[in-house]
Structures are given as structure tokens and as C-alpha cells.
Amino acid sequence: MGADAAIGQIKDAKKRYAAGVLKYAQMGYWDGDYQPKDTDILALFRVTPQDGVDPVEAAAAVAGESSTATWTVVWTDRLTAADMYRAKAYKVEPVPGQPGQYFCWVAYELDLFEEGSIANLTASIIGNVFSFKPLKACRLEDMRLPVAYVKTFRGPPTGIVVERERLDKFGRPLLGATTKPKLGLSGKNYGRVVYEGLKGGLDFVKDDENINSQPFMHWRDRFLYCMEAVNKAQAETGEVKGHYLNITAGTMEEMYRRADFAKELGSVVVMVDLIVGWTAIQSISNWCRENDMLLHMHRAGHGTYTRQKGHGISFRVIAKWLRLAGVDHLHTGTAVGKLEGDPMTVQGYYNVCREDVTRTDYTRGIFFDQDWAGLRKVMPVASGGIHAGQMHQLIDLFGEDVVLQFGGGTIGHPDGIQAGAIANRVALETMILARNEGRDIKNEGPEILVEAAKWCQPLRAALDTWGEVTFNYASTDTSDFVPTASVA
């Protein structure tokens, strides 16, 4: 859509650099003939221009304000390789079914970015343009990160393959639960919840995002009681177990102190929240790599900027940044649970985490091929409002390289925490066996679970309690190309 002639890129240097105000397209931030290089960082924005603002000019403004431009001509541009360093909007298309919205593609020269720094990347790409007055709204939908850039990052400290080898668990999803209530328990009672869940068959139990070090339970007490529970459950079951010890704190120094104590106690995993920021995430990732620890990422706060379709950042972009930054586990949605998540869109997030090369797939919201250049894979985590009665849907949607995390669906079991864990483990093992036997678990799943429940009282009680519970609401973030329905 549009071309240089539509607005008129000024080629004459005297006119281009004369003092005053020019349109962004006139300054060279629009080039409809540009062919992206393999080394370019590419970004796809969804923009909603103000009334009367040409979409090509809006795209050029995004390119300019996220690279080298300001509101007026500055002569110091001539002291730089300005033609190279300018980001270039090179394509604009209307968003299907969304009047007034446009997709715009922008290419960035690799030299604009510091190697190995998500903080620097985000400072450019999202640092300024989202407040720009000529746009009613702006959303970063997807990015293509060139191999040359990807190779400057270390990625996940452990990765899926090595994690499974350390745990000695193969051929099935991993099982987890979040301790409930998330706040208010004493350290001793908290540890009891962890033990009961692990003893019943879970692989992991986790701290929730906001349990740090509060008056009712100091972080050190939590760590001690949780690791006592982990060690006891491991000894009794013969399986490797873990608890995601949340080391999120007010300073990096305190986070390192908590991480060191977790290691001293023998933990295999620590956890941080997304809200600690990109520099902290990369720093803790480096610590985990050096100390042979898994890093679990809770995406606390992401919905403030990922959920709305018109403005913010798609979670697929956040997932790409986190794979570069280096996390081993990432909450990526359930599609069937209580939290926002269109099934096809969520599958796209999983693809970003687990594939060697993520291929363009408009139905799942993926606009670019992404070669991960051998970067380790992230284990997705499905968490939030899921229960044993949905086991067939979860495995059908997400396969086996995933952590299925049943918090309330374990701890809320009418016969107790251990019974809740048993119900989930039996449902999981039953569904994997049925899948391996060639059964159609998507359609036969409820029948398979009911049959298994005849021999497992905890599973029967779980199905009786939650079997009909669904969260069947329309998703707000869906593909613009293929309408999809909830699976619940």
C-alpha cells in the first residue's frame, strides 16, 4: 500500500536537511521498494492512525521514532550514516476485519542494537512510539530476529532436553501445582502443602508470583520448609522432585542472596517474575547457567500490555524475548483454563518456545520465519484454572513438552492435597497410555477418564467435583486471519 510517490521521499539533500519540519516519509523512514536483508531486525506493528493521518505516514512515524528520528530536521544527521541507520517502513496493509487498523512492517539495521541486550532492544522498539500522538493505538505483533543477533544471546540455561535428563522423566508432560492460598500460610504449613503434592505424584510445586518475604512467612523459612518437603518426597517416591523457589526481591543483591541459599539447600530450580525486568532476568539466567539451576519464569503483569488486541505487545513477542534472555520454563497459557488464551494463538506461543525454526503461520499469529540458531528450547507451562477433567484437551493441544500445573485442581480436591495430586497423575498417565495405543484422545478423552476413574477414587472425586467446569469465554486476542472458537 502506498509508494514513495504517495507522500514523496525527498532525495535532494539541501531540501532534506533544511531546517524545519518534514513528514517522516519525506525524511526517508518509508521505502516501499525496500527488500529486507537477512541481517535486519524486522518488526510488525498494528497501528490505528488518528483521523486524517495517512497510514503510510503513520508507519514511517513508527519507523522514525523507534530508530533515529525526532519531530524536526536536525543537521547532525549528516554526521552519521543516516541512510543506513534509519529504520525503514516498507509495507502497509489493512488489518482484515478491523477498519481503521493497519499492519506495518519495519526493518531495522542490526547496528542500531547492542548485542545480547533485551533492555536495549526494547528501549528502541517500544521505548517511544506507543505514546505518539498521531496514533490512536499501536501494538507490536511480531518480530524477526536475525541469526546474527540471536547468536549474541545465551538463551535458556538448561533447556528441555537437559531438564528431562536431569529429572529422568520422558514421554509425558511434567506435572505441577501452585501452592494455595498463595498468601497467608506459615512456613511449616506451606511446606506441608508442598510435601503432600509431591508425594501424590507431582513433579514440581511452585511459589506464586506474589509470595516473596512477608510478615506471615519469611523467605528463608519458606525455602527451608519447602526443601525439607522436596527431600522427603524424593526419598519416599524415588523420583526427582522440585519446588520453584521464588527469589523475586527488591534488589539484585537480594535476589542473588536468595538464589545462593536455594542452591545451598539443594534446589534444582529457582523462579522469578517477569516484572523484575529484562536486565534482572538476563542476570539471573547467567547465574542459573553457572550454577546448573533451572529458571522458572512467571509472567506476572504481562496482561497489562499483551491482552488488548489494539494496543500493547503480543505475548508471542514477549516469548521470543524471554527465549533470548534465557528462561527454562515460561507460563504460556492453557486455552482451556481461566486466563485469556485463544487456542490457535496460544499454540503459536508454544511454537515460539519449542521449535528450532518457528515457521510463518498466520492462523497462529506468527508473521515471520524465526531461526533460533541452535538456542535451547523453553518448556512452556500451562497454568490457571485447569483440572484433571481437561487432561485430554491439554495433551491434544500442547503435546508432551509442557508443564501442566494444577493449583486449585490439586489443592482444592475434596479428599485432600495428596489425593488431588494422585488424580492428576493418574489422569495424565492414563491419557498418555491411550495416546500411545493410538486412541483418539481428543474425542474419546472423557470416556477414557471415566473408565480410569473406576479404579481410582481420587480421580473419580476430581471428575465429580470439576468435570463440568469450563471457562468458555470469547478470547480478546485472536488471529486476524482465521476465526477460532474456544475448545472448552
UniProtKB/Swiss-Prot annotation:
Respond yes or no to whether keyword Protein biosynthesis is given for this record: no
| CDD domains assigned to the protein according to its UniProt record, in alphabetical order | RuBisCO_large_I
Could you tell me the superkingdom of the organism this chain comes from?
Bacteria
What is catalyzed by this enzyme? Answer: 2 (2R)-3-phosphoglycerate + 2 H(+) = D-ribulose 1,5-bisphosphate + CO2 + H2O; D-ribulose 1,5-bisphosphate + O2 = 2-phosphoglycolate + (2R)-3-phosphoglycerate + 2 H(+)
Q: What is its EC number?
A: 4.1.1.39
Which residues take part in binding Mg(2+)? 206, 208-209
Which Gene3D superfamilies did the record assign?
Ribulose bisphosphate carboxylase, large subunit, C-terminal domain (3.20.20.110), RuBisCO large subunit, N-terminal domain (3.30.70.150)
Q: Among the record's GO biological process terms, what is one?
A: reductive pentose-phosphate cycle
InterPro entries, A to Z: RuBisCO, RuBisCo_large_chain_AS, RuBisCO_lsu_C, RuBisCO_lsu_C_sf, RuBisCO_lsu_fd_N, RuBisCO_lsu_N_sf, RuBisCO_lsuI
Q: Please share the entry's free-text remark on the cofactor.
A: Binds 1 Mg(2+) ion per subunit.
The positions annotated as site (Transition state stabilizer) read: 338
Q: Which residues carry this modification: N6-carboxylysine?
A: 206
* SUPFAM superfamilies, sorted: RuBisCo, C-terminal domain, RuBisCO, large subunit, small (N-terminal) domain
Enumerate the active-site residues: 180 (proton acceptor), 298 (proton acceptor)
Q: Which HAMAP family match?
A: RuBisCO_L_type1
NCBIfam families hit by this protein: PRK04208.1
Q: What else is known?
A: The basic functional RuBisCO is composed of a large chain homodimer in a 'head-to-tail' conformation. In form I RuBisCO this homodimer is arranged in a barrel-like tetramer with the small subunits forming a tetrameric 'cap' on each end of the 'barrel'.
Q: How does it assemble?
A: Heterohexadecamer of 8 large chains and 8 small chains.
What's the stated role of this polypeptide? Answer: RuBisCO catalyzes two reactions: the carboxylation of D-ribulose 1,5-bisphosphate, the primary event in carbon dioxide fixation, as well as the oxidative fragmentation of the pentose substrate. Both reactions occur simultaneously and in competition at the same active site.
**What protein name does the entry list?**
Ribulose bisphosphate carboxylase large chain
Gene that codes for this?
A: cbbL
